[in-house]
């Protein structure tokens, strides 16, 4: 779920207005770091309603898991993320040591120094994707049955990609459906979801296209991995033209990992071979931004079919809409 966006040089004139900037005040609260925002009630309500639509499309016999925003560092290292995307990883650090050592760090801060020199890494990292904590859990259950396993997972995720663009957050929500089983089983799962996800996007009133894609692997070796990923059709994305047709935003992705996680974690299928895995990922914040950019900030004016799908009751004539309530509150606070 990544899209390269060119940033203006640091010494350039202020960048021109981005096509999504008009949404910022209605949807987000600045928190002092690019891509990290507080979220308004108007925005969160739509995120939750999109999540409900996705849940209604969940396949039978799918196990639901919800993960915290952090995961075990050793598990992420074993999964291979550090080798593929080291530049995107966020590691949890803390002030460890005896009282005098911690006091020294505080004293350094009081004196105007850099207290972070005393930080050392914990055994946790910020989760870069919702599915990574799943694989060691699945591995602990023994062989995968012939019918395979299907999971619905979600997490608050983090990738160190500071950006002023509202469709590239550092802290974001990801929802995934993950399939573990034989190569044929997980390939069929991905094909079903490519079709199903397009219907969801159409029902949401979004303009989109499906295209081959690759992850932003790090370094020169990563460039070769990206070419291979594309050539083997291991990744597709559902792209929404929020800025233009030439610079679309990936709001969903459809990924086939082959036996990478099966081999890494010792997950075997019913035949005793390394299990294959696939996932469909929904960028919940990108989908919500796409909805507001497509249909406007006042949900009362969204197409009736979209409102019905999301369960938005028709606004009574004369009653203020959620956006009008937000606008009044904004004006009262200014």
Swiss-Prot record:
<keyword id="KW-0067">ATP-binding</keyword>
<keyword id="KW-0547">Nucleotide-binding</keyword>
<dbReference type="InterPro" id="IPR045864">
    <property type="entry name" value="aa-tRNA-synth_II/BPL/LPL"/>
</dbReference>
<comment type="similarity">
    <text>Belongs to the class-II aminoacyl-tRNA synthetase family. Amino acid--[acyl-carrier-protein] ligase subfamily.</text>
</comment>
<keyword id="KW-0862">Zinc</keyword>
<feature type="binding site">
    <location>
        <position position="235"/>
    </location>
    <ligand>
        <name>ATP</name>
    </ligand>
</feature>
<feature type="binding site">
    <location>
        <position position="159"/>
    </location>
    <ligand>
        <name>ATP</name>
    </ligand>
</feature>
<feature type="binding site">
    <location>
        <position position="176"/>
    </location>
    <ligand>
        <name>Zn(2+)</name>
    </ligand>
</feature>
<comment type="function">
    <text>Catalyzes the ATP-dependent activation of L-glycine and its transfer to the phosphopantetheine prosthetic group covalently attached to the vicinal carrier protein blr6284 of yet unknown function. May participate in nonribosomal peptide synthesis or related processes. L-alanine is a poor substrate whereas L-serine or D-amino acids are not substrates for ATP-dependent activation. Does not display tRNA aminoacylation activity.</text>
</comment>
<feature type="binding site">
    <location>
        <begin position="250"/>
        <end position="253"/>
    </location>
    <ligand>
        <name>ATP</name>
    </ligand>
</feature>
<keyword id="KW-0436">Ligase</keyword>
<feature type="binding site">
    <location>
        <position position="176"/>
    </location>
    <ligand>
        <name>an L-alpha-amino acid</name>
    </ligand>
</feature>
<feature type="binding site">
    <location>
        <position position="161"/>
    </location>
    <ligand>
        <name>ATP</name>
    </ligand>
</feature>
<feature type="binding site">
    <location>
        <position position="131"/>
    </location>
    <ligand>
        <name>Zn(2+)</name>
    </ligand>
</feature>
<feature type="binding site">
    <location>
        <position position="279"/>
    </location>
    <ligand>
        <name>Zn(2+)</name>
    </ligand>
</feature>
<comment type="subunit">
    <text>Homodimer.</text>
</comment>
<dbReference type="GO" id="GO:0005524">
    <property type="term" value="F:ATP binding"/>
</dbReference>
<dbReference type="GO" id="GO:0016874">
    <property type="term" value="F:ligase activity"/>
</dbReference>
<protein>
    <recommendedName>
        <fullName>Amino acid--[acyl-carrier-protein] ligase 2</fullName>
        <ecNumber>6.2.1.n2</ecNumber>
    </recommendedName>
</protein>
<feature type="binding site">
    <location>
        <position position="286"/>
    </location>
    <ligand>
        <name>ATP</name>
    </ligand>
</feature>
<keyword id="KW-0479">Metal-binding</keyword>
<dbReference type="GO" id="GO:0046872">
    <property type="term" value="F:metal ion binding"/>
</dbReference>
<feature type="binding site">
    <location>
        <begin position="168"/>
        <end position="169"/>
    </location>
    <ligand>
        <name>ATP</name>
    </ligand>
</feature>
């Amino acid at each position: 779920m990544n899209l390269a966006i060119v940033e203006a040089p640091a010494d350039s004139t202020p960048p021109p207005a981005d096509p999504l900037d008009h949404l910022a005040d209605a949807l987000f609260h600045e928190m002092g770091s690019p891509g990290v925002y507080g979220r308004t009630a108007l925005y969160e309500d739509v995120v939750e309603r999109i999540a409900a639509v996705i849940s209604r499309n969940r396949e039978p016999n799918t196990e639901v898991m919800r993960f915290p925003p952090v995961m075990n560092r050793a598990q992420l290292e074993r999964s291979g993320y550090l080798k593929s995307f080291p530049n995107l990883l966020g590691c949890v650090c803390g002030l460890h040591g005896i009282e005098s050592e911690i006091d020294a760090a505080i004293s350094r801060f009081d004196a105007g120094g850099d207290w972070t020199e005393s930080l050392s890494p914990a055994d946790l990292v910020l989760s870069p994707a919702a599915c990574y904590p799943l694989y060691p859990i699945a591995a602990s259950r023994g062989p995968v049955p012939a019918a395979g396993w299907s999971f619905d997972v979600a997490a608050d995720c983090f990738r160190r990609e500071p950006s002023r663009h509202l469709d590239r957050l550092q802290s974001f929500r990801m929802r995934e459906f993950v399939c573990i089983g034989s190569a044929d089983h997980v390939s069929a799962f991905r094909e079903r979801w490519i079709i199903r996800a397009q219907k969801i996007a159409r029902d949401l009133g979004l303009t989109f296209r499906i295209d081959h894609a690759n992850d932003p692997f790090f370094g020169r070796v990563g460039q070769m991995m990206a070419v291979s990923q594309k050539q083997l059709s291991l990744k597709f994305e559902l792209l929404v033209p929020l800025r233009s047709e030439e610079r679309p935003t990936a709001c969903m992705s459809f990924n086939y990992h082959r036996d990478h996680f099966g081999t890494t974690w010792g997950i075997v299928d019913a035949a005793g071979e390394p299990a294959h895995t696939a996932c469909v990922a929904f960028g919940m914040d990108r989908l919500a931004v796409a909805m507001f950019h497509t249909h406007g900030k006042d949900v009362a004016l969204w197409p009736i079919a979209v409102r019905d799908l999301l369960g938005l009751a028709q606004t009574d004539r004369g009653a203020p809409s959620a956006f009008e309530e937000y606008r009044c509150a904004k004006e009262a606070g200014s």
